Amino acid sequence: TTRYPRRLLVKNDGSCEWVGVLHEVITAKNAATSNETYVEGDYHVISGRFGARNQNPNKYLDDAHMLEEAYAQEQNQALKRRYAYYCGQSYRDCNEPALAAEWYERNIELCSKTGEEVRFSLIALGTEYRKLNDSAKTLEAWWNAYNAAPQHAEALGLIAEYLYVLERYSLGLEVAKKAATLPDPLPHATLFVNEPVHRYVIWYEL
């Protein structure tokens, strides 16, 4: 299960708008005067897959092509970065790991060197390189993900599990021990939380 915060409740006064050609996000028209609060509680959003777009057997490939075009035309750097990331996601979902990695790398080039966006993009990049059986690039991406946000254990958990697969047991154990010392991520301050890594993977490697 992947858990993430999302803006969904807004004041109906015209101060916010949806932005993006796909994977739209709610943004404030005037960021300087906007206020945002994370709502605590046992609330969940049901994500449906019932619209016409989801009946298209080539949905993810078509999405990737649309996002490529939007990326080429977009001047806003934040949206351009977002399009590159979701283009990578779309190629991932239609089982094109090489193209997915290419677009994640474009996204990473537009990100700051630290923080949530680059951390999660590097994790995604490493996952695609693992599919391509490139262990060096997989580990490089995940180490970079950890260095981008060293308070997060997720990248270390993935590294520890992969080192076990590579039969590098001693190093994997040390990485898992380090991961186990880090606190659970705060939902409102984390872009995406890969809960199985925190709940099971790290502890299994110990």
Language model regions located:
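Catalytic-site signature of metal-activated, phosphate-bearing donor transferases
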Residues: T1-E102, S112
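Tetratricopeptide repeat
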Residues: L61-A64, E68, A101, I108, ...
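Short coil turns that delineate tetratricopeptide repeat
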Residues: Q75-A78, S112, E116, P150, ...
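Alpha-helical positions within canonical tetratricopeptide repeat
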Residues: L79, L99, K137, L171-E174
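Start-of-helix register in tetratricopeptide repeats
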Residues: R82, E116-F120, A153-E154, L171, ...
